[in-house]
Swiss-Prot record:
Enzyme Commission code: 1.14.11.4, 2.4.1.-
InterPro entries: Collagen_mod_GT25, Glyco_trans_25, Nucleotide-diphossugar_trans, Oxoglu/Fe-dep_dioxygenase_dom, Pro_4_hyd_alph
Entry function: Displays two enzymatic activities involved in procollagen processing. Forms hydroxylysine residues in -Xaa-Lys-Gly- sequences in collagens. These hydroxylysines are subsequentially glucosylated by a glucosyltransferase activity. Collagen post-translationally modified is detected in mimivirus virion.
The protein, known as: Procollagen lysyl hydroxylase and glycosyltransferase
Organism, scientific name: Acanthamoeba polyphaga mimivirus
Catalytic reaction list: L-lysyl-[collagen] + 2-oxoglutarate + O2 = (5R)-5-hydroxy-L-lysyl-[collagen] + succinate + CO2
Record-linked Pfam families: Glyco_transf_25
Length: 895
């Protein structure tokens, strides 16, 4: 049994505390009472909390991304350590027994159905020493793990430490490992302690006594649907150590940036420096050139700093934009510099290619000698050569007087992007490689087309999207909500104006402008009205876009972008309101490698894109910076439309455009014309699919299922036993109306021992009291449901399995008069859907389904939830008898 449950919770997150306590209350209502302790987490963003611990961080950076530990990861690691210490203290002072079992939970977990029953069943299979048992995790290579018994595996490397059970012996081993002397993320430390290799850091704990570790399969808990988006661990800044000792070096590293500070790319440059803990100094060279600026900076350093500072110099022409991304930690720059040089006198530079950017790295004292020597030579010769860093490196390459410069020809450190083929994207490492297989530490662009590629690099590095962690959302909360100028251009749909009424935003802060103008002059005139309105943001909605999410405005504001818009898609077509790339030969659409992943929401995030139209939110400062947003100029391609002009002008002024597909915000529908409609529209019914698809989905599909229809990766489904899953599919309205249709038709078959069924043309081995969907005219609608809603989920669930056809679809009624149960059987299907249509415990009692080979009974399925399992040979099952009432289920055999 579980002796005590620790729930790690930040004191400043009472919302998460209330949610997890509600989970324990649900268990209590089912007769399961856990001794729960809300354990105050260490807040990694609170220096006072961190000062309580004497800890050191080794030279830790994540091997995949190069990122250091975040404040949240430090706080999380110290929180778990504190729990382990409390367990040891409680055992040693007698408040816990030595043979105790301790459940450790983070506050974003959810107990799965029959948690305690399944926990007892699973743990009864453990007949060997087990120090730690994972109840939920993310295994990196699940297919290589050894299965010990039906529900227990021997884990390899796993991520997450959100739910596990430990013994006193385990806690003591953790305490004896000197974890605080080598603090790394807790979900890296635990695998090391059960024998996994983690980037070489296992050497730090090589002398520690290892634990016996196992994991349940399937999991007994899950994470909340927004666990990652609301994660303190992932979504906090990089931890900045208080001294250099923590990074095992007495040397310094510094970036000196000389160049313009205008445009979004400079802000991005500084954000990457902060992420990777790269110290930087900015020199805006408006008054002098880069040579003079750098010489002056070096002269200001002490001799000690000159001798101990490895300096990376990034110089950008003042007529250009920064467009440079550093994406590596300090130690990587130091290591690569050592690899590329033979001694400390050398300076490593990017390949000189006549760009507006100059980059090199070397020890500050040697750079100072190099510059002073060059300056002295020019002075002695009275040369009139233009003195700048680019010329300095050019001369060094052809003069024997300057032989200390080594060019980084393979792009180990510096990679100029000319076109997309220069780099290779990764969806798992938050880094990119070049075509030689090197992983550059600095990437930069110099042309319009290469800047578009560099902006894609932003999407997959830093805080961008990653296959393991998704996208890091840092919502900005406003103390005072900004004023909004809402501009709506009506084309066909007059009802689009209702968005102003449905927006979840204070109406007194919205100025609404509605226009029917079809002339391009409308746009430029409209932003002039905006500037006079006193509003802070310009929010534009085109008349062919239907907004379905009332919170869209608040959510776009929270992204804190200068220019941002939601994904708008036309049905299931590939037509959307954004372009992932632009053809440099004509200025029009070019498909990007990730276009379909983004519009299908297989990858969810906020994306830097080159073109965005139809719906967008613009900060006032952008319009003040680029007042002629919609004006055509000589640099544009012939035939550029108004949206192309807007995006061209934004790109030219280094204003990034961001596309959010974090939520389903709405869609494009240019075919509707509600102006001609009169009277009250009729209520949508079961039969109105697909003719009234949007309304049908909203009324009948479960909101959770509908919101994940384009991307099931984070969908909230449960594996109730091996390869049997439960998930929300329909609303109670759907279930209620299906029962009403069936009872009204009154076409129920005899069931029971009536084996001949003329509806299916022969003998039914396991007859039920049912009505086929085709008998009530719902077969075509069900076909649409299976192939457009269920089949995409099945592809996600069963390794891209493609649904072929529907064998049968029918509603079964179990009652006390005619048939209350069904004998054990296999279904004649590849997979079977079973949807609960009425409420367990209220409209019927007992019943349910027993999966005989799994030794598992599934009762109490929620209304509208579907169970999906394999048919034919694998899922041998039976319907258990009800004891009162009537039980309705919708069953479909699918191949």
């Amino acid at each position: 049994m579980i002796s005590r449950t620790y729930v790690i919770n930040l004191a400043r997150r009472p919302d998460k505390k209330d949610r997890i306590l509600a989970e324990f209350l649900k268990l209590k209502e089912k007769g399961v009472e856990l001794n729960c302790v809300i354990f105050e987490a260490v807040d990694g963003n609170n220096p006072e909390h961190l000062s309580r611990f004497n800890f050191k961080i080794p030279n830790w950076t994540d091997l995949n991304s190069g990122k250091p530990m975040t404040n949240g990861e430090v706080g999380c690691a110290l929180s778990h350590w504190s729990v382990w210490k409390d367990v040891v203290d409680c055992v040693e002072n007698g408040t816990l027994d030595k043979d105790c079992r301790i459940l450790v939970l983070e506050d974003d977990v959810v107990f799965l159905d029959n948690f305690m029953e399944r926990y007892q069943t699973y743990t009864s299979e453990i007949t060997y020493n087990c120090d730690l048992l994972y109840l939920h995790r993310k295994p990196l290579n699940p297919y290589t793990e050894t299965k010990i018994s039906t529900h227990i595996v021997k884990p390899n490397k796993s991520y997450w430490a959100c739910a596990y059970v430990i013994t006193y012996q385990c806690a003591k081993k953790f305490m004896n490992a000197n974890y605080l002397e080598n603090l790394i993320p807790s979900d890296e430390f635990i695998p090391i302690m059960h024998g996994c290799n983690v980037y070489g850091f296992e050497k730090l704990f090589s002398n520690c006594e290892k634990i016996d570790c196992y994991a349940v399969q399937p999991s007994l808990v899950k994470l909340t649907s927004n666990a990652f988006n609301d994660s303190e661990t992932f979504h906090s800044g990089s931890y900045v150590p208080s001294n250099k000792f923590n990074f095992d070096t007495d040397k310094q590293f510094r970036i000196v940036y000389i160049g313009p500070t205008k445009g979004n790319s400079f802000h991005r440059f500084t954000e990457y420096c902060k992420l990777y803990l790269l110290p930087y100094k900015v020199i805006d060279e408006k008054e002098t050139n880069d040579f003079v600026s750098l010489r002056s900076e070096l002269q200001s350093l002490s001799e000690q700093d000159l001798n101990t500072t490895l300096m990376l110099v990034v110089s950008v022409n003042h007529n250009d934009f920064c467009n440079t991304i550093p994406c590596a930690p300090t130690n990587e720059f130091i290591d690569k510099y050592k690899q590329l040089t033979t001694d400390t006198n050398s300076i490593v530079s990017a390949v000189q290619n006549g760009t507006n950017k100059t980059m090199f790295i070397g020890w500050a004292n040697k750079i100072s000698e190099f510059i002073n020597h060059y300056h002295q030579k020019l002075t002695e010769s009275n040369a009139e050569t233009d003195i700048n860093l680019a010329n300095l490196l050019l001369i060094s390459s052809i003069s024997s007087d300057f032989n200390c410069v080594v060019e980084d020809v393979e792009g180990n450190l510096f990679q100029l992007i000319n076109e997309e083929s220069d780099i290779v994207f990764s969806t798992t490492t938050s880094r990119v490689n070049n075509k030689l297989g090197k992983t550059p530490s600095v990437l930069y662009a110099n042309s319009d087309s290469s800047v578009i590629v560099l902006n894609k690099v932003e999407n997959y590095t830093g805080y961008g999207w990653n296959e393991y962690y998704g996208y890091h959302v840092y919502p900005v909360k406003f103390d005072v909500l900004p004023k909004i100028y809402l501009s709506i251009r009506i084309v066909k749909n007059a009802n689009v104006t209702k968005i102003a009424e449905t927006l979840d935003y204070p109406k007194e802060l919205i100025t609404v402008s509605i226009s029917r103008s079809e002339h391009d002059s409308f746009y430029q005139a409209d932003i002039q009205k905006f500037l006079l309105s006193g509003a802070d943001y310009y929010f534009y909605i085109s008349g062919d876009c239907i907004i379905t999410r009332p919170t869209i405005l608040k959510e776009l504001l929270e992204l804190n972008k200068d220019f941002v818009g939601p994904l708008m898609r036309k049905g299931t077509e590939s037509w959307t309101n954004y372009w992932g790339d632009i053809d440099p030969s004509n200025g029009y659409y070019k498909r990007s490698f990730d276009y379909f992943d983004i519009i299908g929401r297989d990858r969810v995030g906020c994306w830097n894109v080159p073109y965005l139209a139809s719906v967008y939110l613009i900060k006032k400062s952008v319009i003040e910076q680029v007042p002629n947003l919609f004006t055509e100029n000589s640099h544009m391609w012939n035939g550029s439309n108004i949206d192309m002009r807007l995006c061209h002008n934004l790109r030219k002024n280094n204003v990034f455009m961001y596309l959010s597909n974090l939520r389903p915000y709405g869609h494009i529908d240019d075919s509707i014309n509600l102006e001609v409609l009169s009277g009250v529209p009729t209520e949508v019914t079961l039969y109105d699919l697909p003719t009234r698809k949007e309304e049908w989905e909203k009324k009948y599909l479960h909101p959770e299922f509908l919101s994940h229809l384009q991307n099931f990766k984070d969908f909230d489904y449960t594996e109730i036993c091996n390869d049997v899953y439960s998930f929300p599919l329909f609303t109670p309205a759907f279930c209620k109306e299906v029962i009403e249709v069936m009872d009204k038709a009154n076409l129920w078959s005899k069931g029971g021992d009536s084996y001949f069924d003329p509806r299916i043309g022969g003998v039914e081995s396991y007859p039920t009291q049912d009505t086929q969907l085709y008998e009530v005219g719902l077969d075509k609608q069900w076909h649409y449901v299976v192939f457009n809603y269920v089949a995409p989920f099945v592809r996600h669930l069963y390794n891209n399995y493609k649904t072929k056809d529907i064998n049968l679809a029918f509603v079964v009624k179990y009652d006390m008069e005619r048939q209350s149960e069904l004998a054990p059987h296999h279904d004649s299907s590849t997979y079977t859907l079973n949807i609960a249509l009425n409420e367990y415990g209220k409209e019927y009692t007992a019943g349910g389904c027993e999966f005989i080979r799994h030794k598992f009974i599934w009762q109490g399925q929620k209304v509208g939830y579907a169970t999906i399992h394999a048919g034919k040979l694998l899922a041998y099952h039976r319907a258990l008898p009800i004891t009162s009432g009537k039980r309705y289920i919708l069953v479909s055999f699918v191949n």
